[in-house]
UniProtKB/Swiss-Prot annotation:
Transmembrane annotation, as ranges: 5-25, 341-361, 362-382, 427-447, 473-493, 520-540
Pfam families per the UniProt record, alphabetical: 60KD_IMP (PF02096), YidC_periplas (PF14849)
GO BP: protein insertion into membrane; protein transport
Species of the source: Pelodictyon phaeoclathratiforme (strain DSM 5477 / BU-1)
Gene, per the UniProt record: yidC
Localization per record: Cell inner membrane
A GO CC annotation given for this chain: plasma membrane
Stated name of the protein: Membrane protein insertase YidC
GO MF term list: membrane insertase activity
Length: 583
């Protein structure tokens, strides 16, 4: 490896480590707002004891509906088991059937199981703030349990009579094979009663954490919205601070997410804006979020009939993108102009294609590494041969540097000529590595946040989306972490071996330093990376070592450059110095 190659690789390694430490953007707190306290309670009883009716001055015309008896209805399809409540016409539980939590237990997407996650919120002209979770609806559907499969559909309708000619209807629509739930809102005779001529549809409580590493998952948890072609994010990461974001405009969706799952509200018609807020409780990694759509209501409307969809499920790129509202934008693949295209148009499509005939994602990663090596083979082959030629030129170049040591301009001119005649590029050694950086960073984002690798094992790695830790220290070592991962160690060995057999233009001392420093830096960087990323880089290095062995074995003296250095033979130089220049 020449000096430029080593310098380039060292800079890349430093960038990777610094990027790892500072990749999370700073979260700016806003003014304090109401704390949203969350609980995880799954209601299992069909009927809940009645409660007393609150005072009329809290609910106005809704006072008669603020007390009653709660009735639960369970709906099960191929993908989840949902529990609906007549108190609030809300969703109290949604347990995913094909995805478990970090302890391999059933995972409930609803964090606010006591009050429910979904509701309407509005202010009456009397100044009463109404959250429909405080109201008792009648269930037009008399079932207590319904199971549907495949393309079967099922609707649950809740009705609330408020006053003569005034009513609220909320209808849930389920399909047997879909994470999407239809959510219809019908307001009769309310247009003139709503202050500000609007109401909100909200998801309250965020999404529960699903993984064992809660601090890591907290980095992915947020509330988000997509409106006007722009992504809005709210990340409540700091304790004792409230965060709030409110914007007007037509939104395609609002959502809350954790690392691998999302709950999204998607309007079928126009929305008037969005409202997001969040807070992290003291001493708790969990971040509670609220995401709401603002819906305008014409003051002259007798009946308001608004339709929405809920997407309640995994952050699976293909499924999320199939919603056709840009919901895939909530998935973090890094820089939109650099790493995201690699993730969306190369990594995920290739993985999805290979998963059609290879079920093990460890094998898919190995095949992918081989394919990338195959694609970059011409470039890396040319680069390696160029480095080998550079190594062969070193004795002559040192002689040239000695001759023109007092004339830097002439030296650079001669070096350029010689490089051109020899067909070498002095910076070509690090070019393949530099070109792979966007792909490597994109793979980091994909492996860290996409559900495709989650809980898929390979060899000793139990989960390819997290480090392949075999031993935990119980404390953190700065820059290294709190555990020992195997793939990074093996990868560092292959980096060392690759440098060992690669031609170099460095001095022995320089070579000794880089032979150990660069593998060590890569070990530090990859120890906390997903196991899938370490496996990819390990296999890519193994293929690179095999390629280097092949080049070293097949390259002969005839392949080495023959250039005219423009230097006189040593004897002629001595005669010229003794006799002086000819006149």
């Amino acid at each position: 490896m020449d000096r430029n190659s080593v310098t380039g690789l060292a800079i890349i390694a430093v960038i990777m480590i610094v990027w790892l430490q500072f990749m999370s953007p700073e979260k700016k707190p806003l003014l304090p707002s109401k704390t949203v306290k969350t609980e995880t309670v799954v209601q299992s009883d069909v009927q809940v004891p009645a409660v007393s009716i609150p005072a009329a001055d809290n609910f106005g015309v809704f006072a008669s509906s603020s007390g009653g008896q709660e009735k639960l209805l369970k709906v099960e399809n191929d993908l989840f088991r949902a529990t609906l409540s007549s108190k609030g016409a809300t969703l109290k539980s949604l347990v995913l059937k094909k995805h478990l939590d970090g302890n391999r237990l059933p995972f409930d997407l609803v964090s606010n199981g006591k009050n429910g996650a979904l509701s309407l919120l509005f202010l009456t002209r009397e100044g009463k703030k109404i959250d429909t979770r405080d109201l008792y609806f009648s269930n037009v559907t008399l079932d207590t349990l319904r199971t549907i499969k495949g393309k079967e559909s099922y609707a649950v309708r809740y009705h609330l009579d408020v006053a003569p000619q005034q009513a609220i209807d909320i209808i849930f629509g389920f399909t047997g094979d879909s994470y999407k739930v239809d959510y219809d809102v019908k307001l009769t005779g309310f247009a003139s009663e709503l202050a500000g001529n609007e109401y909100q549809v909200q998801w309250d409580g965020g999404v529960p954490f699903s993984e064992k590493n809660r601090p890591d998952e907290a980095q992915s948890a947020l509330a988000s919205a997509y409106l006007g072609g722009s992504l809005v994010k709210l990340d409540a990461s700091k304790e004792k601070q409230s965060y709030r974001e409110e914007q007007s405009g037509e939104a395609q969706w609002v959502a809350v997410r954790n690392k691998y799952f999302v709950a999204a509200l998607i309007p079928h018609g126009k929305s008037a804006g969005i409202y997001l807020d969040g807070k992290r409780e003291t001493g708790n990694d969990f971040e509670s979020y609220l995401a709401a759509l603002k819906i305008a209501v014409p003051s002259t409307a007798g009946v308001v009939d608004d339709k929405f969809s809920l997407y309640l499920g995994p952050l699976d790129y293909n499924i999320v993108k199939a919603q056709k509202v840009g919901l895939e934008k909530i998935m973090d693949f890094g820089w939109d102009w650099l790493t995201r295209p690699f993730a969306e148009f190369i990594i995920l499509p290739v993985f999805s294609w290979m998963n059609g005939f290879v079920s093990n994602y460890g094998l898919i990663i190995i095949i992918f590494a081989f394919l990338i090596k195959l694609v970059t083979y011409p470039l890396s082959m040319a680069s390696t041969k160029s480095m080998k030629k550079m190594s062969a030129l070193q004795p002559a170049l040192k002689e040239l540097q000695e001759k023109y040591k007092d004339n830097p301009a002439k030296l650079q001119s001669e070096l350029g000529r010689i490089y051109k005649e020899a067909g070498v590029n002095p910076i070509g050694g690090c070019l393949p590595v530099v070109l792979q950086m966007p792909l490597l960073f994109a793979m980091f984002y994909v492996f860290r946040s996409s559900i495709e690798l989650r809980q898929h094992s390979f060899l000793w790695a139990k989960d390819l989306s997290v480090p392949d830790s075999i031993f935990d220290f119980g404390f953190a070592i700065p820059m290294y972490g709190s555990h020992i991962a195997v793939f990074p160690i093996l990868m560092a060995v292959t980096v060392y071996l690759q440098q060992k057999i690669t031609p170099t233009t460095q001095s022995n001392e320089q070579m000794k330093v880089m032979m150990y420093m660069f593998p060590a830096m890569m070990l530090l960087f990859f120890n906390n990376m997903p196991a899938g990323l370490g496996l990819y880089y390990l296999m890519f290095n193994i293929f690179s070592v095999a390629q280097q062995f092949y080049i070293n074995k097949t390259t002969t003296a005839a392949d080495m450059p023959q250039v005219n250095l423009g230097l006189a033979p040593a004897g002629a130089q001595r005669k010229q110095k003794k006799g002086g220049a000819k006149k």
